[in-house]
Structures are given as C-alpha cells and as structure tokens.
Amino acid sequence: DGTDTYTTPPFPVPDPKEFNDYILVFPAGSGIKPIYVYLKEDPRKLPGVVTGHGVPLSPGTRWLDMSISNNGNGAPIPAHIADKLRGREFKTFDEFREALWLEVSQDPELIAQFSSGNQTRIKQGLTAKAPIDGRHYGPKDIVKKFQIHHRVAIEYGGSVYDIDNLRIVTPRLHDEIHYRR
C-alpha cells in the first residue's frame, strides 16, 4: 500500500525541463504493460541557421499574387530577401518569421505590393493578411494571415530554416496542401 516505504528522489535532482521521455506504469493487475513515451521538441522552437538561396523575381512580378500564393505550391522567398537572411541564427522559427517580414518591409518594391494596413503590419514584423479569397474558414476559426509552408514537411526531414524549402501560401492553400491533396 506504500505507507511504510519511503521514496528517495534522485540526486542530483534533474532539471524538470530536461524531461522529454516517460514510462507510463498502469495499476497492478490491469494487465496493461508499461509504455515508453518520448516527447519530441517542436523543431520550430529550436534554434537554427538560415540556409538556401531563394528565387530571383522577374522585373514587375507581384510576389504574393493570388495566382501564385493561392494555387500550386505557393510563392518562393525572393533571392534578395534570402541573401539578407542567409547565415543568420534564430532562436525560434517565430523569430525567423518576424525577420523575414521585416526584410520585406525594407524592400520598396515588395512593400508597395501590399495594402496600407498590411504595410503597417509588415513594418512591425507581423505577417501580412491574405486577401479574403485566400482565407481559410475552418469549423472553429478563420485563418487570415499568409502562412510559411515547408515544402518537405519537417516531420519528414524538411529543414526548418532552409529558405529553398519554404513557400508563402494563403491559409486556404495551406489547408489544401496539408489536408486535401
């Protein structure tokens, strides 16, 4: 019953944030064997260095035109934006996302392609909102902001910070790529 047994904690006591695996033990007599569980850290929350070259934009090309960002595989990261990010280390993918949009805000040709409301967002490092036709209307919420899609999914070995693995897509296309193809 455990009333006459003392449990001694391990020494030194491990830092709780280092625990990422467990053994689940079920009650005696339940017939269920212990299960080993490993909780993997989300790679987007891990640091990384930006790689990749992006794609040169043809003169006069609208980067996030709906025909690109709402169809196919989305819009690639422009090469001149990739050049500014390549080699930089970020603590998380969220920090990378912010830096990407801030670099876009510094490019007069790219920033001019956005509405004034989106320009304000982008200059703050926030993601631009997609046009209404590109939004995803889910059962619980409406996703309005452009998404950064990993062409080769992270779970299948796709690099988190490789610009050549990234595409900017509308929420609608992102949903289609992940759940309807």
Residue ranges and their predicted role:
Residues 1-147, 152-181:
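Nuclease and nuclease-like effector domains acting on nucleic acids or nucleotide cofactors
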